[in-house]
């Protein structure tokens, strides 16, 4: 019961604070006059919850409505003392039968005239459940507390009325009319000029996806926007300088010199000869994948080429042959004992006759890593080599050649100057009025009262709230990780001493939810009575500090206890 009273007090205070701020919203209909005022009107016993002397106020008053539970001399220590504070529940003449007897041990909960006997007495606090009119007869009667759902004006008539807090969703101009209106913040995505036309430089804008020339025609055109990747000097010319850090691949010519050789540029991707025609060597091009001889026949050396995948003997027949190249994994000595031994088990990689040498054949292709010409010299064969990374023009000079568009990162105007230009597509996020100011205007929309806060229930933990908007970074505290208010899970990590956005400290009175609908919610879980006021105040002030909403007027934390 005490816990019920705690929760009801918090709920009443929250609702009271909301109603105090949001007059005259139709939500106030929940307060005056209420369909359940019958629960409070005199003479019902329930009014004893608020009547004078108020039973609830007795939570601090003397004597308490439940002093009967503790009546002196016994206090809670009476749990072992005699007589017990609850001996009234059992003491003769009334025992538990007092549920029917008069007076009841808990009559203090209701104060005369009506006591708990009202369960049978007339008039009962809940006789309304059967009496006429009932507090909920409104569910069928007219007007109903929710007739407003159909009646006019409704607490939420704003959902249909004009102006609605969200009438902008249908009204003109709407906060998002720009989604359809002209000009739209993003009409530039299709309009000319675009906010990001700077990304493309005139004349092409994003419309260039269909327009001619295309922003990426430069991928084929000359000069390319990225030709600067090829300009001189390049930021990575050092990759091309002499000596190179990796020139120590040491061999001359390099196995990849073919990747670098002038003169073809990246444009050669379509040009003739291709920078990689060396992969295929004339006359075959990529079609050589099926042609004979193959561009990579060098990898295998004649007679076997890549066709060796079907040819006999296969370069890998050794995988099936006997002895296997790796039988040494089981054999003695082991193939790797040679890491210290002489000769090495993998000298076979270079010397005939091991089966693995099939990868090399005669002359061994693998040995070509040192041999001349290399099996992959085709990858490199002059004129083009990898040296093109240093040569001029570079194979990718197209990526860099002036007038480089990419240089716009430093040029004026910048491609993203629109992000700073006026007007911005998102200036409305800072402009006044905001498209959504209706959601936060003062007086606050009626509907926001439905979302200001809620009471999450009693006795069991609430479900985790959806992640809300990020709040301000919280102060650092033990164990060190700082959580951001308003978020749960990965953002606000659980840790003592507990903070809004994290699970609350354990307590005896179940769970209390402070719910901030639409922006996430904080759970203040298992709050001990002595800590609830501070925890609620923190949650409240954190909410107001992190969100500049129209209901920030609810700055005063709800009173508790």
From Swiss-Prot:
A- repeat residue intervals: 41-50, 51-60, 71-80, 91-100, 111-120, 201-210, 261-270, 281-290, 301-310, 351-360, 361-370, 381-390, 401-410
Glycosylation sites: 46, 49, 56, 59, 66, 69, 76, 79, 86, 89, 96, 99, 106, 109, 116, 119, 126, 129, 136, 139, 146, 149, 156, 159, 166, 169, 176, 179, 186, 189, 196, 199, 206, 209, 216, 219, 226, 229, 236, 239, 246, 249, 256, 259, 266, 269, 276, 279, 286, 289, 296, 299, 306, 309, 316, 319, 326, 329, 336, 339, 346, 349, 356, 359, 366, 369, 376, 379, 386, 389, 396, 399, 406, 409, 416, 419, 426, 429, 436, 439
Ranges of Low complexity composition bias in the record: 466-496
Region (Disordered): 452-507
Spans annotated as 27 X 10 AA A-T-P-K-P-W-T-A-W-K: 61-440
Tissue expression per record: Produced by the byssal gland.
The entry's keywords: Glycoprotein, Hydroxylation, Repeat, Secreted, Signal
The organism's place on the tree of life at top rank: Eukaryota
Residue numbers carrying 3',4'-dihydroxyphenylalanine: 22
Compositional bias segments (type: Gly residues): 453-462
B- repeats: 61-70, 81-90, 101-110, 121-130, 131-140, 141-150, 151-160, 161-170, 171-180, 181-190, 191-200, 211-220, 221-230, 231-240, 241-250, 251-260, 271-280, 291-300, 311-320, 321-330, 331-340, 341-350, 371-380, 391-400, 411-420, 421-430, 431-440
UniProt modified residues of type 4-hydroxyproline: 33, 65, 72-74, 85, 92-94, 105, 112-114, 125, 135, 145, 155, 165, 175, 185, 195, 202-204, 215, 225, 235, 245, 255, 262-264, 275, 282-284, 295, 302-304, 315, 325, 335, 345, 352-354, 375, 382-384, 395, 402-404, 415, 425, 435, 497, 500, 506
Residue numbers carrying 7'-hydroxytryptophan: 46, 49, 56, 59, 69, 76, 79, 89, 96, 99, 109, 116, 119, 129, 139, 149, 159, 169, 179, 189, 199, 206, 209, 219, 229, 239, 249, 259, 266, 269, 279, 286, 289, 299, 306, 309, 319, 329, 339, 349, 356, 359, 366, 369, 379, 386, 389, 399, 406, 409, 419, 429, 439
Span of domain Collagen-like: 459-510
Annotated region described as 13 X 10 AA A-P-P-P-A-W-T-A-W-K, given as residue ranges: 41-410
Compartment(s): Secreted
Main location: secreted
Domain notes for this protein: Almost exclusively composed of repeats of the decapeptides APPPAWTAWK and ATPKPWTAWK.
Function: Provides adhesiveness to the mussel's foot. Mussels produce one of the strongest water insoluble glues. The mussel's adhesive is a bundle of threads, called a byssus, formed by a fibrous collagenous core coated with adhesive proteins.
Name of the protein in its database record: Foot protein 1 variant 1
């Amino acid at each position: 019961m005490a816990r019920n009273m705690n929760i009801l007090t918090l709920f009443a205070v929250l609702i009271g604070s909301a109603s105090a701020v949001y007059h005259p919203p139709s939500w106030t209909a929940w307060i005056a006059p209420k369909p359940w005022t019958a629960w409070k009107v005199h003479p019902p016993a329930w009014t004893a919850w608020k009547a004078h002397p108020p039973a609830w106020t007795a939570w601090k008053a003397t004597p308490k409505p439940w002093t009967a539970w503790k009546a002196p001399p016994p206090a809670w220590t009476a749990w072992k003392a005699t007589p017990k504070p609850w001996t009234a529940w059992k003491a003769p003449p009334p025992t538990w039968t007092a549920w029917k007897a008069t007076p009841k041990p808990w009559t203090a909960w209701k104060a005369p005239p009506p006591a708990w006997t009202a369960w049978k007495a007339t008039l009962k606090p809940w006789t309304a459940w059967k009496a006429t009119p009932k507090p909920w007869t409104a569910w069928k009667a007219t007007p109903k507390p929710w007739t407003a759902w159909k009646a006019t004006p409704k607490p939420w008539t704003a959902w249909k009325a004009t102006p609605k807090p969200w009438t902008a969703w249908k009204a003109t101009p709407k906060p998002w009319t720009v989604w359809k209106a002209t000009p739209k913040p993003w009409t530039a995505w299709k309009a000319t000029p675009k906010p990001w036309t700077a990304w493309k430089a005139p004349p092409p804008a994003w419309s260039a996806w269909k327009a001619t020339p295309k922003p990426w025609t430069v991928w084929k055109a000359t000069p390319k926007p990225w030709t600067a990747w090829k300009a001189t000097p390049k930021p990575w010319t050092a990759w091309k300088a002499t000596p190179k850090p990796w020139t120590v691949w040491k061999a001359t010519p390099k196995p990849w010199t073919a990747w670098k050789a002038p003169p073809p540029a990246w444009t050669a991707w379509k040009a003739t000869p291709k920078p990689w025609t060396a992969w295929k060597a004339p006359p075959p091009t990529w079609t050589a994948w099926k042609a004979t001889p193959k561009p990579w026949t060098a990898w295998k050396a004649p007679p076997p080429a890549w066709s060796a995948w079907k040819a006999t003997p296969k370069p890998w027949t050794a995988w099936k042959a006997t002895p296997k190249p790796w039988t040494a994994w089981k054999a003695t000595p082991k193939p790797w004992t040679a890491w210290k031994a002489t000769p090495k088990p993998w000298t076979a990689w270079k010397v005939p006759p091991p089966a693995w040498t099939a990868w090399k054949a005669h002359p061994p292709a693998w040995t070509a890593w040192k041999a001349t010409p290399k099996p992959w010299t085709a990858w490199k064969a002059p004129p083009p080599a990898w040296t093109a990374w240093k040569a001029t023009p570079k194979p990718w000079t197209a990526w860099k050649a002036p007038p480089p568009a990419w240089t716009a990162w430093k040029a004026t105007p910048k491609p993203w100057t629109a992000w700073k230009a006026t007007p911005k597509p998102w200036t409305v996020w800072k402009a006044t009025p905001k498209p959504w100011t209706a959601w936060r205007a003062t007086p606050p929309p009626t509907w926001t009262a439905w979302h200001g806060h809620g009471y999450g229930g009693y006795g069991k933990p609430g479900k985790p709230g959806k992640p809300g908007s990020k709040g301000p970074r919280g102060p650092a505290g033990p164990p060190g990780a700082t959580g951001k208010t308003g978020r749960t899970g990965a953002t606000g990590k659980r840790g003592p001493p507990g903070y809004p956005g994290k699970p609350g400290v354990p307590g005896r009175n179940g769970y209390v939810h402070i719910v901030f609908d639409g922006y996430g919610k904080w759970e203040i879980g298992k709050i001990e009575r002595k800590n609830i006021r501070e925890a609620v105040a923190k949650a409240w002030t954190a909410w107001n500090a992190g969100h500049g909403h129209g209901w920030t007027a609810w700055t005063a934390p709800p009173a508790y206890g």
